[in-house]
């Protein structure tokens, strides 16, 4: 899988930052974890976007297409796409604009809501989803260095963060959630 441009440093900059942080501010475990997650996101997104580039997609556009492909009728209101992908309505509009321009989706009026708009995946869009997904699966979504139990651990740890942030309420009996994090709203109030 293509990856972000390697930094090729002779040391781990996050580990070094954690050492300095510890000397100046105190415990660095949370800072090092968050910085590692942010860097991992950059690496993964760069690699995934590189795999999807031959299809004229970014990972954000791919997610929207897959969401439409998953829907029973191949259509969803733009509002629902935004909710499911957890993005701002403007981002959904821009994503659908590009997909429509490329002939992968089309807009049509929502018959249940006279003001709303549906995005509908086209046959070309379904074909692109099938082919691009095969490439992502072959690359294991950039996570080929991890075995299934490790991927499960990563999912569970990050799921706890998402639950604590209020992304969703887990169903009773769902997998255990890791330690809670400070929700973004509480961080904003402290400033």
Where are these regions (language model features)?
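Short amphipathic alpha-helical segments with heptad-repeat character
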Residues: 34, 38, 42, 86, ...
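Charged, amphipathic alpha-helical coiled-coil/dimerization segments
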Residues: 97-156
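N-terminal helix-turn-helix DNA-binding core of bacterial DNA-binding proteins
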Residues: 28, 38, 42, 46-88, ...
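Amphipathic alpha-helices that form helix-helix packing interfaces
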Residues: 40, 44, 132, 154-157, ...
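N-terminal leader segment of winged-helix/HTH proteins
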Residues: 1-55
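Short, flexible, glycine-rich and Lys/Arg-enriched loop motifs at helix boundaries
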Residues: 15-26, 71-74, 138-144
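C-terminal regulatory/oligomerization modules of transcriptional regulators
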Residues: 1-25, 149-191
């Amino acid at each position: 899988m293509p990856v972000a441009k390697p930094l090729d440093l002779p040391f781990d900059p996050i580990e070094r930052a954690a050492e300095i942080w510890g000397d100046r501010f105190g415990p660095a475990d949370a800072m090092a974890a968050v910085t590692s997650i942010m860097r991992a996101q950059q690496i993964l997104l760069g690699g995934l976007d590189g795999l999807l580039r031959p299809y004229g997609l970014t990972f954000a556009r791919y997610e929207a297409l897959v969401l439409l492909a998953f829907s029973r009728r191949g259509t969803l209101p733009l509002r629902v796409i935004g909710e499911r992908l957890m993005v701002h309505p403007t981002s959904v509009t821009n994503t659908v604009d590009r997909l429509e321009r490329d002939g992968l989706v089309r807009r049509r009026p929502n018959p249940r809501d006279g003001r709303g708009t549906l995005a509908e995946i086209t046959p070309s869009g379904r074909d692109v989803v099938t082919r691009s997904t095969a490439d992502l699966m072959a690359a294991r979504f950039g996570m080929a260095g991890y075995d299934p139990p490790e991927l499960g651990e990563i999912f569970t740890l990050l799921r706890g963060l998402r639950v604590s942030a209020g992304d969703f309420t887990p169903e009773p009996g769902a997998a255990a959630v890791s330690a809670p994090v400070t929700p973004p709203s509480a961080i904003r109030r402290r400033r």
